[in-house]
Amino acid sequence: MTEELFSNSETCSLSDPLTSKTLSSIENPFDDPYILSEESEILTIKTDVLRPNILNRKSSFYPEADAPVRKSNLQVKKIFENQVLNCDGIKVAITIPDTSLIAGSLLHGNIWLSYEGAKNVETGVWIKEMFLDFYGILNFKGHSEPFYSISEKYSFCNLKTSALILSKAASASIGNKGLFLKCSCKVGFPFSFIVPLDIGPGTYHSSKLELLYYISSTLTLTSLDQNIRCTRCTIPKRVITSMHNNIAELYNPISCIKSLPYLSLEEAKTTLEVHTDRSLFFSGQIIDFTICYTHNHHRRIHNIKARLLETHIFHPNTQNHYGGYCMNQAEETFASCGYLKRYQKTKTKTRAKSTWKIANKSVYSNLAPTLKNTIHAQIKIPEFCRSVNLKDQLKIDYTLEVCFSAFFKPRILSIQIPITILHSWN
């Protein structure tokens, strides 16, 4: 059994594009579920080449800069619905670190191709090209729709033969059709993949909504009989959005004031003020805020209520049926021309609330109009809350609402402060 080494690909660094970064240790091929017989030959391709510029790649095995990527949601959805494609005698697997992916980081992994050639039979297979897809899927009430995708195409055609080191003759060769595998072997293709910063909100699970991410590898193969086949392997991956100090600024004071005059020509007799030191929180944290109010009005006010409101805004795809609505052919025609606004469904829920009773309920109290009462309030954010913005598909916004309420009028005077909730991965 012979181990061949192919040092022909590339790496890159996010911090300094001129700095070469070595790949993590390559996994033992026999740790993989696709174990070959002892007579099988192992060909390993290793990446340790400097990439001066991401779009100006110098090595021979590289993602093609001008290659078409899978921009269509229909293409990505087909990959999601057919996550595994098997060919006779050919299997593919992906090995990557068993950790969460962080937006903006550099991912190192290996794609393993296991080829079992028939004994005493002149067979072989050409590996022409490989697609590496990273995509996100929105699952809502049984419907699935891609919300993010990026793809890189790797070509095996016209590789430099000088970069291929073989200590044993002719188990693999390179031609204008790609990499030719003649007998049983296992090939490893290490890759370096930059996880984009704009990947969306990250992995998310709730009772009705899921945001899931997948990494998929699709290899295009051509056998000696010229039949083109594909083999694919897809694995789910947990994704975390990037947290930067300049983005997650903790101190950002906000103050809002509203008043309610007795008559339109009089001074304000009732005022409500809300102060908070932050507008950005993590799930599970406590929102600290201060309520200041004065009340000398003819209306009776019994208490002050504070609520954490969660608003879902859906923009359904015309091919799906979110909310039981689907555009007909005429509506789709007008929508494609820009004459029809996209259907929108909004739903608001209360995720947390608190109530404080007011001692001075009416104008007949001795409370002076200029005297302010202060309440130091808190509301705990549930662990599952997170702000989500999927552009034209889905938005989840959060608002802190503080209002005066009475028996027959729940909102006499209200203040709403928009807040952002990030998911805590601690």
Swiss-Prot record:
Q: Which InterPro entries match?
A: Arrestin-like_C (IPR014752), Arrestin_C-like (IPR011022), Arrestin_domain-protein (IPR050357), Ig_E-set (IPR014756)
Q: Does the UniProt entry include the keyword Cytoplasm?
A: yes
Question: Is the keyword Ubl conjugation assigned to this protein?
Answer: no
Q: Which keywords annotate this record?
A: Cytoplasm, Meiosis, Nucleus
The UniProt GO MF terms for this protein read: calcium ion binding; protein-macromolecule adaptor activity; ubiquitin protein ligase binding
Q: Which GO terms describe its biological process?
A: meiotic cell cycle; ubiquitin-dependent endocytosis
Report the subcellular localization: Cytoplasm; Nucleus
Q: The organism sits in which domain of life?
A: Eukaryota
Q: What is its main location?
A: cytoplasm
Example GO CC term: the record gives: nucleus
Matching PANTHER family: ARRESTIN DOMAIN CONTAINING PROTEIN, FI21816P1
Q: What does this protein do?
A: Has a role in meiosis.
Report the sequence similarity comment from the record: Belongs to the arrestin family.
Query: What's the protein here called?
Result: Meiotically up-regulated gene 170 protein
Question: Which organism is the protein's source?
Answer: Schizosaccharomyces pombe (strain 972 / ATCC 24843)
Lineage, broadest ranks: Eukaryota, Fungi, Dikarya, Ascomycota, Taphrinomycotina
Whichever gene encodes this chain, its name is mug170
